[in-house]
Amino acid sequence: MLLMVVSMACVGLFLVQRAGPHMGGQDKPFLSAWPSAVVPRGGHVTLRCHYRHRFNNFMLYKEDRIHVPIFHGRIFQEGFNMSPVTTAHAGNYTCRGSHPHSPTGWSAPSNPMVIMVTGNHRKPSLLAHPGPLVKSGERVILQCWSDIMFEHFFLHREWISKDPSRLVGQIHDGVSKANFSIGSMMRALAGTYRCYGSVTHTPYQLSAPSDPLDIVVTGLYEKPSLSAQPGPKVQAGESVTLSCSSRSSYDMYHLSREGGAHERRLPAVRKVNRTFQADFPLGPATHGGTYRCFGSFRHSPYEWSDPSDPLLVSVTGNPSSSWPSPTEPSSKSGNLRHLHILIGTSVVKIPFTILLFFLLHRWCSNKKKCCCNGPRACREQK
């Protein structure tokens, strides 16, 4: 009996020793920001302190565990809504959660989390090289640049809670820029990206966001088919429709043109022949060129199929293989207009030249007669 009591006491002591470091503050919680730690000035963010399960009570610290004045002496429950966010809120944060059974009553501090406040400088630009459509496994470079001399650039993917990627800006030809490399494209890296810039003395006060850039991973599903109605060669001014179809049940089709800045998208419609199709009307005034289409599903809009085989659309009788824009006159109409101007100008100039020649000829004839008859005749003529 005594041996059993001693054994239970040893087990209890062992459990206390194991629990002590966790409940006594050695097991770190983590601090989260929702919807994102990158917050526009005037926006809002909710901070929560977690440890396995969310703490009922927690305290917030900013920069080296110093209380922010609005946090001083306050214990938060569930979460803290920071609104409206100002530049004063930018910086490093940690939290401590309450542990009723720990000696100190509080956990160890969490790892720091950075709150970045945006909208403090003019937005930079974001480009993808070689382009925003990236085949699975291939490399893409996202370049953030600005004519403002930013010391650092940040790249952030929407709806991702982790801190943005950060690079030092390189100055070249009066432009500050940074190249963010994605070495091997995969599903997890596709999405909408924005970039920001910051200056040295305020590293967590960022510029306005760049325009959004959608990075799409392709080559994940079988390719659809692309055809032209009435055909890939049409008469000038004739309408043409491009049809993208597949037996795969794609929800959306995307049409891209080589050299085009934007793709067009249309929902797929199920046809009686059990194919899923979308018809893209180009109309008589859109450009010809080489087209491809892709398919995607509703639940993964940034994950596309292999591209269809390329389809060259051209205009017969037009050497440029493209239709003129409604706001741009064709070369033929421009030449005719130039010819009309030349003809009109010539009609005015020819009679004027004849009249000038006639007057000059008459003047010379009178002068010749004057010289033949002598000075007296000339004076009489005057």
Swiss-Prot record:
Signal peptide: 1-21
Top-level taxonomy: Eukaryota, Metazoa, Chordata, Craniata, Vertebrata
Extracellular side: 22-340
Tissue: Expressed in NK and T-cell lines but not in B-lymphoblastoid cell lines or in a colon carcinoma cell line.
Domain Ig-like C2-type: 42-102, 137-202, 237-300
Protein role: Receptor on natural killer (NK) cells for MHC class I molecules. Upon interaction with peptide-free HLA-F open conformer, triggers NK cell degranulation and anti-viral cytokine production.
The keyword Signal is assigned to this record: yes
MF GO annotations: MHC class I receptor activity
Subunit structure as annotated in this protein's UniProt entry: Interacts with HLA-F open conformer; this interaction is direct.
Name of the protein described by the UniProt record: Killer cell immunoglobulin-like receptor 3DS1
Organism: Homo sapiens (Human)
Protein family according to the UniProt entry: Belongs to the immunoglobulin superfamily.
Membrane topology: Single-pass type I membrane protein
Alphabetized SUPFAM superfamilies for the sequence: Immunoglobulin
Keywords, ordered alphabetically: Cell membrane, Disulfide bond, Glycoprotein, Immunoglobulin domain, Membrane, Receptor, Repeat, Signal, Transmembrane, Transmembrane helix
Xref: SMART domains: IG
GO BP: immune response; immune response-regulating signaling pathway; natural killer cell activation
InterPro entries xref list: Ig-like_dom_sf, Ig-like_fold, Ig-like_Receptors_ImmuneReg, Ig_sub, Immunoglobulin_dom
